[in-house]
Design a protein with these regions (language model features):
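Glycine-rich phosphate-binding "P-loop"
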Residues: 138-139, 161-162, 272-273
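Catalytic alpha/beta core domains of metabolic enzymes, predominantly
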Residues: 128-129, 142-249
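Active-site beta->alpha loop and helix N-cap motifs at the rims of alpha/beta catalytic domains
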Residues: 2-144, 154
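C-terminal alpha-helical cap/extension of soluble enzyme domains
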Residues: 5-16, 34, 38-40, 49, ...
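Basic, gly/Ser/Thr/Pro-rich low-complexity segments located predominantly at protein N termini
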Residues: 13, 26, 52-55, 85-87, ...
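Short secondary-structure transition/capping segments
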Residues: 55-58, 91, 116-119, 147-149, ...
């Protein structure tokens, strides 16, 4: 079952751009190869970190196909299919080609600020529109509304193809409530690199990671050790990343991880407006920490 495979370190893929801001498909394929070679457990394609709202429909189709073809079934593909127009998502799920997609990631509707009942009905409509496994995504810092533990559990209990939640509320009490009361066939996945270790100690099964773009091998090692109950060694790795966790998001995501990958010589440091690269002070701080870490990946 797919919920047994969406564990460990999933990587939220960035979209590399060239200097002219066109998609750098060659760099994207090199990144996918790098992640496959360095123990990423699954890939999240066309999520927040991919700057998906700034991509054209044609670019999204091309990225999806190229990544699926390159992965070729070696690890699961989680595809971002979300928005704040329920009807449009339902139409997408009914009409698009999802060959090679193992599950979809669907964010809580943003901007409209639905009630908890509205959130429930939104996911009910999505669940009924597809047989694909669904991973919920709660990130109130971006959406403007928090999906409560009660609503999450109600959805998890009522819709069998809803298999997990990517939880990025930052509310450990809420996450713990979900973990303690969830059905057996429903998992909690961290949506925040910095709390992955403590969340696994509570019963989460892994992370959809941003920093994993740069350090898949070492971050995967941390999650695997934690999942095996080797908390001492996992915590040692977690502490090595603490400063980078902060730098990743000080100027927004994916600006931080793109600066990181640029400093490593893997991509151009380009984003599409309204996002911009990190400040030079942040970039230099990232480069300094990278030099100090000297992590072999």
């Amino acid at each position: 079952m797919i919920q047994t495979k969406l564990k460990g370190t999933g990587v939220a893929l960035i979209t590399p751009f060239k200097e002219d801001e066109s998609v750098d498909y060659d760099a994207l394929m090199r990144l996918v190869d790098y992640l496959l070679q360095n123990n990423a457990d699954f890939l999240c394609v066309l999520g927040t970190t991919a700057e998906t709202p700034t991509l054209t429909e044609e670019e999204k189709k091309t990225i999806k196909k190229m990544v699926i073809d390159r992965v070729n079934g070696r690890i699961p593909i989680l595809l971002g299919v979300g928005g704040n127009n329920t009807r449009a998502i339902v139409e997408t799920l009914k009409n698009d080609d999802f060959t090679g997609v193992d599950a979809i990631l669907s964010v809580v509707p943003y901007y409209n600020k639905p009630s908890q009942e509205g959130i429930y009905q939104h996911y009910k409509a999505i669940s009924e529109a597809t047989e694909l496994p669904i991973v919920l995504y709660n990130v109130p810092g971006r959406t403007g509304v928090n999906m409560t533990a009660e609503t999450t559990l109600r959805i998890a209990r009522n819709f069998s193809n809803v298999i997990a939640i990517k939880e990025a509320s930052g509310n450990i009490t809420q996450m713990d409530d979900i973990i303690k009361n969830k059905p057996d066939n429903f998992n909690v996945i961290s949506g925040d690199d910095g709390i992955t270790f403590p969340l696994i100690t509570l019963g989460a099964v892994g992370v959809i990671s941003v920093i994993g773009n740069a350090f898949p091998r070492e971050f995967s090692r941390m999650t695997r050790l934690a999942l095996q109950g080797d908390f001492a060694n996992a915590l040692t790795i977690h502490h090595r990343f603490t400063e980078l966790f902060d730098l990743l998001f000080v100027d927004g995501n994916p600006a931080g991880v793109k600066s990181m990958l640029n400093a490593m010589g893997m991509i151009e440091n380009k984003l599409r407006l309204p996002l911009v690269p990190t400040r030079i002070t942040t970039f230099e701080a990232i480069r300094k920490v990278l030099n100090e870490l000297n992590i072999k990946c």
